[in-house]
Amino acid sequence: MDTNVSNSWEQRDMQAVFHGFTDLGTLNAEGPVILTHGDGIRVFDVHGKSYIDANSGLWNNVAGFNHQGIIDALCAQARKFPGYHAFFGRVADTTVALSEKLIELSPFDAGKVYYTNSGSEANDTVVKMLWMLHRRNGQPQRRKIITRVNAYHGVTVATASMTGKAYNAEFGLPLPGFLHADCPHYWRFGLEGETELEFSARLARNLEELILKEGPDTIAGMFAEPVQGAGGVIVPAEGYFEAIRPILRKYNIPFIADEVICGFGRTGEMWGSVKYDMQPDIIVASKCITAGYFPMGAVILGKAFCDALMKVSEEAEEFPHGFTAGGNPLGSAVALKSLAVIEDEGLLGNVNKVSGRFMARLKKLGEHKYCLLYTSPSPRDRTRSRMPSSA
């Protein structure tokens, strides 16, 4: 990296840009990577070097970089009607069309769609929806939010409190009332001799004990990712969601699927909640909704919840919440085209086609004598503890 070259892109970055979620010691020693463009699965830096972006722009770019159809849709909308809000009963026609499409694609009987600019904002919005609904229904004490250890739901004050990661202690979070149930990572947390189904049943019992300890009438809702992405791509143990669903319904606790990462094909289904049989009341979406070409988040409300929220909002004369760019027509046009690309170009089928081959080749790589690092589950008598950060 040209961190010592005067006026290099790297030096300019280090003087002007504050990077989040970045080891600043390593950044100062090695410098940043400054990117200029992308094409397909590759991104290119200022020196012309290309990289396979295996993380897909933080799970965003489901259609790859430089997809001409999506770019054309964005440009056409920019020429027609580049930006507007969804306040005061006004909205762009493209946003109405997108809402209809999301309702069509939803895995449940959907009511309406609410728009934000990110997954964090969408999850935060649902918290306020829950609080308003319970308060208006005479249950103002129902404010506690249940998530899980190693969960990731965002970076706002509320969603960082929901995120089950230790680093949020730097901000004095979580706030009171944000509870973290067990992480459904069977390999790491399963007991000796315990099957996956037994593990899932134990976690369900623990969840019910948590609810009873806190008081069922104090719980506003539970959020869960189909696969815990930032927590380590943790696939839920067999039978996990089937085990916890009846408990949530028993105590009338709304269940929210955070599909910010898993939604729109990442798991080989349009929704991760379908693949793992979550059956949520609300879906939160972002990222692949626009294939990474425009910031957007969406809350898809199940009809029963939506009807209840609309009723109390009418009583209050409004739902007093919103974002200036939420439901932006540019984002809506991009999302409509991105969803068409996912369907028309067979992205779901391709995920299912290549995933088995990818895993087979990954295992084969582990057998190669020059493989630098290959990991697989160690014997059950190992500690299964995390490697130290200094490793």
List PLM regions with ranges.
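Hydrophobic alpha-helical segments, chiefly the membrane-spanning helices
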Residues: 386-391
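Conserved N-terminal phosphate-binding loop of PLP-dependent enzymes in the Aspartate aminotransferase
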Residues: 2-376, 380, 384
